[in-house]
UniProtKB/Swiss-Prot annotation:
It comes from the Eukaryota. The gene is clec-158. This is C-type lectin domain-containing protein 158. The keyword NAD does not apply. Keywords: Signal. SUPFAM superfamilies: C-type lectin-like. It comes from Caenorhabditis elegans. Residues 1-16 form the signal peptide.
Amino acid sequence: MQKFILSAFVVALVAADCALKCPDGYFSFKRAPSAKNSMTGLWCVKAILSDTLISPNQAKQVCEKDGSILTSFENLDERTKLATVLRDFLSAKKLDRGGMIVDGHRLKNCETDDRTVLNAEPCRNSSTGFTTDEKHTDNTFMWKSWADTEPGQSIFEKQIESCLQLAISQFKSRTELINDVFCNYVKHPQNEGAYDLWNYGAVCGRLPEWN
């Protein structure tokens, strides 16, 4: 009996020592594994922010430099925690608005300036006209997290707003929510003073590692 108890104790110690763990600086988001998130039970997420504004197209590089990939949130708790990090960052800079890039973009056939296509299914539907690349996050909740009046479908020089940001806004109906933005521009090409469309970084994710 004593040998059994000792063996069980050793097994418990080994299991605890070999637990999956997220790197320092990353949130450890526990998720319900499902086919929609590739059976991911733990996903490590970090908002990587800096004083240098980025275009959405630069976001993947920001994550890659940290050994991660561009990601997003799966539920309200995750969204709130990420938004809080962004809000605190902006407050430290004495700013009351701004954003960071999250995974997500329009479907390829919806990246058009043809209003006939944009106003038809699936493009006109905010939950079917967009998709995500990262497969460890169920994006169902994200498509319910649009800021008021979004997605906006603004077009500039035949380019449509296709990438996504999570933003802090001075308006309650738009803060801590997602918005479609131009992928190629650091600032809005038609309104460079729209500070809520400035992006200071990206939301990055990675799988945990055995400790």
